[in-house]
Amino acid sequence: MSLNLAALAQAANEARGLGMDAVEKAASGHLGLPLGCAELGATLFGHAFRYNPDKPEWLNRDIFVLSAGHGSMFLYAWLHLSGYKVSLDDIKQFRQLSSTTPGHPEFRDTPGVEATTGPLGQGVGNGLGYAVACKMAQAHFNTKDHKIFDQKVVVLAGDGCLQEGVAQEASALAGHLHLDNLIIFYDSNDVTLDAMAIESQSEDTAKRYEAYGFEVVTVKEGHNIERILEAYEHAKNSTSGKPQLIILKTTIAKGITEVAGTNKGHGEAGVKFVAAARKGLGLPEEKFFVSKGTRDYFQAHKEKLQKEYASWEKLYSEWRSANPELAALLDSAKVTPDASKLFSVIPKFADAPIATRKAGSDVLQPLAKALPLFISGSADLHGSTLNYIAGAGDYTPKNTGGRNIKFGIREHAMGAMLNGFAYHGIFRPSGATFLVFSDYLRPSIRLAALSHLPVIYIFTHDSVAVGEDGPTHQPVETVSSLRLIPNLDVIRPGDHEETAGAFVAALSRTTGPTLLALCRQNLPNLSQFDVNARREGVLKGGYILQKETGALKVIVISTGSELNVAVEAAKRLGDGVRVVSMPSTYRFDQQPAEYKEEVLPSSCKKRVVIEAGVTPLWHKYVGLEGKIIGIDRFGTSAPGATVLKTLGITADAVVAAANSF
């Protein structure tokens, strides 16, 4: 399809009109980017991009991530014009309750939206994750005769995105990994929300990205479709082996003369000038107007794209016939792993005391072998988090099939990249660091939970038992604060077998992220209790580890490394004491009322909780009469056992609390 500049220019102005009308109707939203990047949208969606609006999950589609998610009407307008299932009525419901056009793009809610974005810079990390996943897919599934994967990943980012630390971490890693399938369009309009960008930035962005290892092209005429296309085609076909940054010099809110090029053009301030702007753009007074010419153009373009899809589908069918084992492996990406099958590949543990981080490593190896699409990364801590997949190789520019990813000391980029992997959907991502550093990637964890992404976090060194490193490295509030994130399953296993259950629980969950909080110090394997009961009990979040002898008098509840302390205390207390292990409050809370009553009968008011962390969240489980043994202060630097004793995380404390009723 030849380049039809007149049709694309008309479509750009009509997309501007849709943006203005939607924001005006909602009395809320951001006009700046949808108007400032309209020609970019026309170039990509109207000519250069490979997609199929009827098959939005096409495996080999080009990926578009709107990192500057506040400009969501840019994306909705182009999805509508391109023929995705985003209707004009959907556009009219922009930012309204239960609409498919929310204020910021949300994955799964809107066909064609590839990532949940809004917190600036996250989309850059997501794009990097997508790009690595695409490279890995090529390495794992392409053959000499059938190259079924060769797509590009395009990110649209603004000044705010590139100022954020997560984007800087991700960009540095993208250059290091030579991700030549990644193209970042930088909407360089020299404006931020508060003021002109020069008031908060003065670096040379082009030189910064060249230093990262990018090839950089600047398009001074950012509203010239021919120049944009030239830059995109250059980036797409470059043989430099580098990721690409295209700096697009644009005018924010172009079309609304009164606010264009100023920070007032960022939000909805220009709405009161929409009528004049519509006239200046050559649009009729009719709201939400799309001309027949634009409809016809995109229908013809859609037919062209569908021919490309049909050609690929033929290639894909031939690939499946020629490579049944690879086809089965690819199909497995859409199948939720069966917990019983996963348990069957994990060997039973010996009785020797080991840390749950080491138990995690022992569990991870057979599971990773059984699940060839499972990948594991670490923020420069594989040697401590022990989540390296033996024999799977490192992902490098020369080994793009490697399943271990070295993120470097870039926790935030790791979090955003893991989300990108999960959005991609073929590989099952996991990443590791120390639990106390989870705060460095919390925004990405939150977005994973919001987007229902099956990311697995392996966070070790989970309590004050870290010891000598002191309070900067001793998480006390961290586990509880993470439990507050909706749809995040935080599992803190108490021994080897519970660790096996935790990994299986994580891998068999596909509706959201799972966080495994593992300890540094050695723990006894509670081998006096049934192996399967411990493994499978984790799947329910909480279970009776040790049933009382005789009439029930006291319930002791515990998690993680304090579970053995609870068992020791129960032994000393004697008859009538029940020990409940609760590695996951999230899972336990989802159990039927009958099960929860069976584990924690309401008739028993005498309850004690022990966990080496802050106490407030435990009140719902002990009630007004219960006792909580925890740590409502920061830790201290000393050997781990000394710290635990000093802060009262002991069997003596549990016994004293139980006897105080």
From Swiss-Prot:
Family: Belongs to the transketolase family.
Protein name: Transketolase
Residue numbers binding Mg(2+): D159, N189, V191
Keyword match Hydrolase: no
UniProt binding sites for thiamine diphosphate: H70, G118, P119, L120, G160, N189, H266, F437
GO molecular function, one term: metal ion binding
Assembly and interaction partners: Homodimer.
Cofactor: binding details: Binds 1 Mg(2+) ion per subunit. Can also utilize other divalent metal cations, such as Ca(2+), Mn(2+) and Co(2+). Binds 1 thiamine pyrophosphate per subunit.
Disulphide bridges: none
Residues where substrate binds: H30, H266, R357, S384, H461, D469, R520
Gene3D superfamilies given in the database record: 3.40.50.920, 3.40.50.970
Source organism per UniProt: Physarum polycephalum
UniProt function note: Catalyzes the transfer of a two-carbon ketol group from a ketose donor to an aldose acceptor, via a covalent intermediate with the cofactor thiamine pyrophosphate.
Cofactor(s), names only, from the UniProt record: Mg(2+); Ca(2+); Mn(2+); Co(2+)
SUPFAM superfamilies on file: Thiamin diphosphate-binding fold (THDP-binding), TK C-terminal domain-like
A Gene Ontology term for the protein's cellular component: cytosol
Catalytic activity: D-sedoheptulose 7-phosphate + D-glyceraldehyde 3-phosphate = aldehydo-D-ribose 5-phosphate + D-xylulose 5-phosphate
Swiss-Prot/TrEMBL site (Important for catalytic activity) positions: H30, H266
Pfam families hit by this protein: Transket_pyr, Transketolase_C_1, Transketolase_N
Annotated keywords: Calcium, Magnesium, Metal-binding, Thiamine pyrophosphate, Transferase
Domain of life, source organism: Eukaryota
InterPro entries assigned to the protein according to its UniProt record, in alphabetical order: THDP-binding, Transketo_C/PFOR_II, Transketolase-like_C_2, Transketolase-like_Pyr-bd, Transketolase_bac-like, Transketolase_BS, Transketolase_CS, Transketolase_fam
UniProt EC number: 2.2.1.1
